[in-house]
């Protein structure tokens, strides 16, 4: 079984990205393959060098998901519109296009959007 998790919200403003990452990690721990696609303001979830002091560290959750086998792709045009480059992203997160998102959806049994 394979899930694609689409994250559209930035971290630290709302809890959607946090819920998405918890969902992805739980699926991985249950042996389900997971693709994560960061879209719109969700691209900020993969921005490296985040160090929040009083809330859960989303970046660490994303790194954990990658370590457990999640494939993470980040919308390139969304990054460009926000001044982010691939070198601004954590290791394991790759710039992508809508073609990549379509490929994720086609190969998945379920797609969940947060």
Curated annotation (Swiss-Prot):
Q: What are the GO cellular component annotations?
A: cytosol
Matching entries from InterPro entries are given as: DsrEFH-like, Sulphur_relay_DsrE/F-like
Give the source's domain of life in one word.
Archaea
Q: Which family does it belong to?
A: To M.kandleri MK0008.
Q: Which PANTHER family match?
A: PROTEIN YCHN
Q: What is this protein called?
A: Uncharacterized protein MJ0989
Q: Which organism is it from?
A: Methanocaldococcus jannaschii (strain ATCC 43067 / DSM 2661 / JAL-1 / JCM 10045 / NBRC 100440) (Methanococcus jannaschii)
């Amino acid at each position: 079984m394979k899930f694609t998790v689409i994250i559209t919200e930035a971290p630290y403003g709302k809890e959607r990205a946090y819920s998405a990452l918890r969902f992805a990690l739980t699926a991985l721990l249950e042996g389900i393959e997971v693709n994560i696609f960061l879209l719109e303001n969700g691209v900020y979830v993969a921005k490296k060098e985040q160090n929040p002091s009083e809330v859960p560290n989303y970046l660490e959750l994303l790194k954990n998901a990658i370590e457990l086998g999640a494939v993470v792709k980040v919308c390139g045009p969304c990054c460009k519109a926000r001044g982010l480059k691939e070198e601004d992203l954590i290791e394991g997160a790759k710039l992508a296009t809508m073609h990549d998102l379509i490929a994720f959806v086609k190969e998945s049994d379920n797609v969940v959007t947060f």
